[in-house]
Amino acid sequence: MDKLLINGGKALHGEVVISGAKNAALPIMAASLLASDHVTISNVPHLKDITTMMELLGQLGAHLIVDEKMNVQVDSSQVNEFVAPYDLVKTMRASILVLGPMLARFGKADVSLPGGCAIGTRPVDLHLKALRAMGADITVKNGYINARCKKGCLQGKRLMFDTVTVTGTENVLMAAVLAEGITTIKNAAREPEVVDLANFLIQMGAKIRGAGTSTIEVEGVESLNGGTYSVMSDRIEAGTYLAAGALTRGQVTVKKVRPDTLLSQLCKFEEAGAELTIGEDWVSLNMHNKRPQAVNISTAPYPAFATDMQAQFMAMNSVAEGSSTIIETIFENRFMHVQELQRMGANIQLNGNTAIVHGVEKLTGAPVMATDLRASASLILAGLVAEGETVVERIYHVDRGYERIEEKLSLLGADIKRVSDR
């Protein structure tokens, strides 16, 4: 099993090109099942979750061609299987995203209940409730969601999510584009990745209004065409590298980004004392060798501060000047990195969904274990600033969401390498 060896204490300097967003690429790849012709998706990151989605689409009968630049061509005209098996779905929660497209286009889908990061309860009940309201007959038995269309096709409805759900919004959005009539989704997720999916669907012929707001309206069409689409850049990867620059007191520029999707993070970096310069598709952060100031964080759905950046900011606050409060409102079990940061000398107290972080002068390298995707990123960041060697175990988690993270950090001056126990 691979692990990362990090010798910390070096300020990071330089530029890093940000990859395509995993959380946009996965639903877009799932949406290719809706098209009557082949689609070509570019700027797809080379990640384990992406490979899993490719395997899943292939299992369903889609034909995929991938070139050396990770341009992915999907032809779903020959789809002849309607079961998303446990062996694939268990490793990736986003596998649930094939449910809406399969149900809308083929009228049936059997999807194993999803897996992914062990960061608490992320039920699919909201997805199923909405699809049932649109006319689907759904049962859950032996670990599988068995969905069928009662009337041959889904019916447009007025839907209201009880809580904001990104994958739920995406699943229903994809189902609605081929439904009969108009579907209105209230309390819809506003994340940029939802907008990216909507733009992809619109390019293929879908009729969608309001993506990026809390109310999305979809007028169903008979079929979708093929097309070509470039996935948006990864705002969480961008924020992670900016955080690496901030906590090492360095200067880092992230390129090929959309600054408008980073506003909640950028405000907090400025509050921490960073000097920011923002261009059309890049952001430069410069700490001028200053220790960051502690910043308070409260996670919430977009456009508020992203839960996927909480762990990285906790690493920064661990070595910041002053004390901070971090409140996690999205997931109930997303502080699993705290115990590992404490092994490195971080001063953190937990009380329910709140962490109190007292910044210390330095962290000390230690063997630590990644427990989920973003927790692994926080441990790597902590290793970059710690004195001595940090060994991060179970980095298959980080490989699910960061493309070549050790190579990109090395280009910024980090002393980091991947080694294998094999």
UniProtKB/Swiss-Prot annotation:
SUPFAM superfamilies: EPT/RTPC-like (SSF55205)
GO molecular function: UDP-N-acetylglucosamine 1-carboxyvinyltransferase activity
EC number annotated for this UniProt entry: 2.5.1.7
Pathway: Cell wall biogenesis; peptidoglycan biosynthesis
Residues the entry annotates as binding phosphoenolpyruvate: 22-23
UniProt keyword Transferase present: yes
Catalytic activity: phosphoenolpyruvate + UDP-N-acetyl-alpha-D-glucosamine = UDP-N-acetyl-3-O-(1-carboxyvinyl)-alpha-D-glucosamine + phosphate
Cell cycle among keywords: yes
Residues holding UDP-N-acetyl-alpha-D-glucosamine: 93, 122-126, 308, 330
Enzyme class: transferase
Active site: 117 (proton donor)
Location in or out of the cell: Cytoplasm
Gene Ontology cellular-component annotations: cytoplasm
Keywords tagged on the record: Cell cycle, Cell division, Cell shape, Cell wall biogenesis/degradation, Cytoplasm, Peptidoglycan synthesis, Pyruvate, Transferase
Matching CDD domains: UdpNAET
Modified residues (2-(S-cysteinyl)pyruvic acid O-phosphothioketal): 117
UniProt record, GO biological process: cell division; cell wall organization; peptidoglycan biosynthetic process; regulation of cell shape; UDP-N-acetylgalactosamine biosynthetic process
Similarity comment text for this entry: Belongs to the EPSP synthase family. MurA subfamily.
Known function: Cell wall formation. Adds enolpyruvyl to UDP-N-acetylglucosamine.
The protein, known as: UDP-N-acetylglucosamine 1-carboxyvinyltransferase
Species this protein is from: Legionella pneumophila subsp. pneumophila (strain Philadelphia 1 / ATCC 33152 / DSM 7513)
